[in-house]
Structure formats: structure tokens, C-alpha cells
Amino acid sequence: MIAIDFEYNNNRLVCVCCKKSDTIYKFWLADNSDTDAFKKFVNDNKNEIFCCHALEKAEGQAFQRMDLDPTDYKWYDTYTVESIKTKATNLVFRENSLFEALSLVALEQKYLNKTSDETSDRSKHKHEMRDIIIADKELDEHKTEILDYCAEDIDSLEQIAIQQCKDYAELVEKYKAVKTFNLKLENFQKYTSYEQWMTIFVNLCHAVAIYSKCAYKGLNINDKALKIIAKKDVILENLKRAFNDKFKTDAFVFEQVVIKGRGKTKSAVTVNLHGKKDSKILDYLASQAESEIQKIHNDFIWPKSDSGKFKLDKETLKSYCICDTEFAKDLSEIETFRSGLAAVENFDKTLITHPCHHMFGAQTGRCTPKPTDGFLPCMGQLFRSFMNPRDNEHLLVSIDYSAQETAIAAAWGKDKNMLWCYQQPDFYVAAGYKFGVIDDMHATKKTHPRERDKCKLLCLTSNYGQGYKATAKLLNISEEESKDLIKKYTDTFSGYSDKRKRLLYNCSKSLVPTVLLTDDGMPYVYIPEDSAKNCKDKDDVQHIHKFFHCKSKFFCKPSTSLGNAPIQSAGATMLRYIINRLNEENIDLVCSMHDEVILNLPKESWKEQADRAIQIMTDAFKNLYGQDAYIHVGEPEVAEFNGVLIPHSDRVIPRFKKLIEFGVFSENDVKIE
């Protein structure tokens, strides 16, 4: 293994240090004097594993600046591995104080038993050196000092990597419980070697190297459109006018607020009505609707979440909002549009934003960036129209699965009824027919909208293991009706439901922590609630504390997260397969999200490359569930750039028309064909 670390002066490479065995190699890159020597060094050691911290943002970018393809090398990224492990505490632990930083200094304290004083001194020294490195001075004056500082980081990288892998090996060795999500017992002795875990994580980090290439190329953004939406005051004024006109009042005053949370900043639209400040638009609508409906139905209560807040998803608004349905949907779209502006403000001034793929921020490896993280493609289809191809010779092509999670659930559970419903034009209508909620075999979304919505919510909540009480609140029905509906679901989709129950039973009743493996070997650590509550062995408690590097009396995972883990982990496995194959075939990946890839394809040959990508996506599913397994890949959505804003699909055109109506854009700004 070779530990490697770069130092930057803003976007300029300053130096790199490498440690192989006990020898440290230092290369000065600020004046390119050692660039060729470094390139020769890495190429001479191509068979070694390069160990780094934050591959996508640092080493991957640096390699490409020197015309080195990061996917030609084997990587171990301590940041990615720790992210998978510690982000899992979101489901394991209940207190924010248990979350640990993922910086290299924090990892040194965790894995190398550094004291608080040592960590504090180290952090102070790093800040002092960073001030020297990024200062607008001649770096050659501090060359020796900077190189020595760079070498300090690599001294601990290899030790951290080995200890990360040993943690998994020791957990398996102690509890001897390794299974796949299909409940097949694995040879646990194979996984008591830290070298085996090293191999698993090196394979994982190959996908991170591919993503570093996406980040290096960046994402082109429509400059003109950004300047338009930057005029927030104009948008708020027009939103206020449209809303007041709708309710024939002038009482509404709209404000843009910024909410700062743990590591995140998001933007929200609030309404100040009759002196009541910070009331969200949709909360106001729900409260108003509840009062009006209670005049007719005394016992009506607007559906609420477990925390007691109004449910404000589109389906609930559509069902109960007293203003017309389309306006409720419009408000929801405007709310999403406005909340995205905080992220837009964080875009790079060059109008190129590097897509930060957080797909490894969950133990399943399946995690998508949120709109407030500044990841444009996740801001809904409306915001996707702000993306441009890399140049006028290319097109942006978006390809995704149709109801991927349903197809995975049907294949995983070998559920014939679920597969039949999936193969119909509308899964939820077909499911409603199977449940007996819809009596017309030829029903459609338009003919039975309410019944379909009920079946959709039932399927989604049941897939995530929601109980009858929560389902009753969500659907606004009695608990007895909820029990009956859930029984219809489990009886109809018995293949999937029974498989899920077996997984929950086998893991939660095992009374010991279990390492579940995804189809490509990724670990998912499950600690049953009973084992945590009944654990009297202090050594067991300490061992689990050590694994997660935190202290807590409780370290159990809810069964709902475990029940959905096979679906999410399979989706992550498929995505890793897809991006690896796209990279092998030189198909230009711009970014990926959940079950979708966005490609930058040549105008002349985009259809051929899109067809190849569709075949790769189909192969990813069949590799998991056999050649007879069925999944549908949607038709590609194509977008080009000709200087104005062009909606990418028919589904967002009505939203742009509404934005024009609300005064966000003029008809000259948007081309709607």
C-alpha cells in the first residue's frame, strides 16, 4: 500500500507526498519541477493500492490535472469507508452528539488513540500551515516546511485504513455471523481477515474514482437562467401578488429565510399573515383547509406526521386542499423552486458546479444528495432544465428505471403477483385491482385517481414496513380499515412480504450483531434491538462501542430500516455496476442519482450510445436476479442547448408556464415547443 496526499493553493497543485513501506517520497509540483518524476512513480507502482483521504475531491482531481486517469489505479479512500460506517449511526443512535467528524484529524483520534490535547495541537498546526500554503506568496520560500507538513498526513493514512478493515474483521470473528440479504450463510472465516475487507473496499472505491472524473469535468449551468432566478425580490413580489389574487386579499407577505442546520443550509419561503411570522405557505393552507372541512365534517383532522406536523406531500395536498388541486400542486412546485435558491447561491462563479455524489453516505451505499446540498440534478425536473451539455456538439441524455424498487422487490421475493402488476401500464392501478380496491380491470389513473392514490400510499408505506396506525393516519381511515388494507397487501404480495418477514426474524432474533453482505460484497452491519437490551456482557458493549467509535446505552437498528435494506443495497449494487461499465465503454457520465444516469453524448451517435447504456442498465438487474428477471428502463430524455432555457420533458412544461404566469420568467426567456 502507498499512502498519498496532495496540497493545494486554491486550485493550484503545490506538492504531493507518498509513503511506500517506510520510505517517504516528496514531489514539488508548484513549478512542475517534479511532475514527471511523480507520474513515473505512480505508473511504476500501478499494482499497489493508493491510500488517500477524500478521493473524489482531492487525489482524483489532482491525477486528472496531470493527465492521469484515476480509474487506472487501485484506491482505498479512508473518507468513503468511514462515511459508510459512521453515517449508519443515523439509524443506530439517537443523539446528534454521537456523530463524529470525518476529517483526517478526527480519524487519527479514533483509530490511533490520539489524546484530545494531541488532536487540538494537530488541528492548530494544520490551520497554521494551511494559512501559509493558501497565502498569496512565493511558495518556494516555504518549500521544505510545506513538504514536511504534507508528509505528516501520510504517516497515519495506512494505519487508519488497516484499522478500519480490522474493525470489520474483529466484529465477524467475535460474533461469527455473516449472511447475504438472501439469508445465505457465508463462510465467516473468510471475513475474519482484514485483507479481505481491504479488497472489498478497494473495489468500492473504484466507483469513487469514476465519480472523481465526473466532478473534474463538472456540470454546465445555464448562465442566463441563473441570473434571472437570482432576482429573488422580484420573484417574491410576484409570488405574493399571485397568492393574494388567488385568495382575494392583500394580507400575505412573503419572505425568504435561510435555515442553518448541522452542516447544511437551506432556504424556505414563509408567509407573514396577520402578524403570525414564519408560517410556511403550505402549513397555512392545511390549517385553513382543516377549519373549513370541519364545518361539514366535525371529526375531520388533516393528516399529520408522527411529530404532529401537517403532512404536506403532493398526494395529501391533492386530496384535502380546499383551493383547486392544480393550485395546490403549483404551490408545492414553487416551494421546491424557491427552496433550491439557497443551493443555487453556492454554485461556483464560473457556472460550473462539481456534482458531489453522496451515494456512499449510507450503510447500504444507496444515498442521494438533497436539493439543499447544492446538487442541481436533485432539485426536481424543473431545475434539471438549467443543465446544459458540455458543448454544442453534444446532448444531455437522461435514462432511468421505471419503478426500480418495485422491480427489485418482486425479483428478490420471487413474487409473481408483484411482477404481474409491475408489467402492467400502471403498477398502482393493477395493485388496486388485485387488492379489490378497484373493481374495473381496465381502470386507469384518470378514471380512478383517489383509489390509485390510496393504493400508492399503501404500497410505499408497506414496502418500508410502516404499521397500521401510521398508515391509518396517512390515509385518514380507521385503524380497522388500515389493518384490512395491509392484510390485502401482504396476502397479495406474499412472496415479497414473507421474504421480508424471514429476514427481519432471522436477524432480529439472532441476538448478536450480524454483518449482511450485498451482492457485490458491501457490508451492512445490523445490531438487533434485543441483543442491545439484553446484553449483559460488558465486553460485547465495549466491542460495539469500539466499532462505531461512540458511547451510548442503545445501539439498535429499527426493523423498518433493515426490511428495506435489501432493496436499497441492490439498487446501489446495480448503480456501481452501471457506472463501472459506462466507464469501461467510454460513455461520458455526467452524474447519477438513485436509479438514473445523465450522459453527455455526441449528437451524431447519441442513439447508439443511449441504447448501449440501456442494455448495461438491463444487464445490471439480470446479473443479480437471473436472465429471466424483468425490469423496464424508461425512454431516454434528450436536451440540447441553444442559448435559452429549454424544459427537458413534457412533464415540466406546465410548471414553466406557471413560473411565467408568476413572473419568474418572461416568455422570451424560455423556449416551450
Predicted regions and their residues:
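Acidic, glycine-rich two-metal-ion catalytic cores of nucleic acid-processing enzymes
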Residues: 4, 9-12, 17-22, 252-446, ...
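Catalytic palm active-site di-aspartate
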Residues: 153-154, 158, 209-218, 225, ...
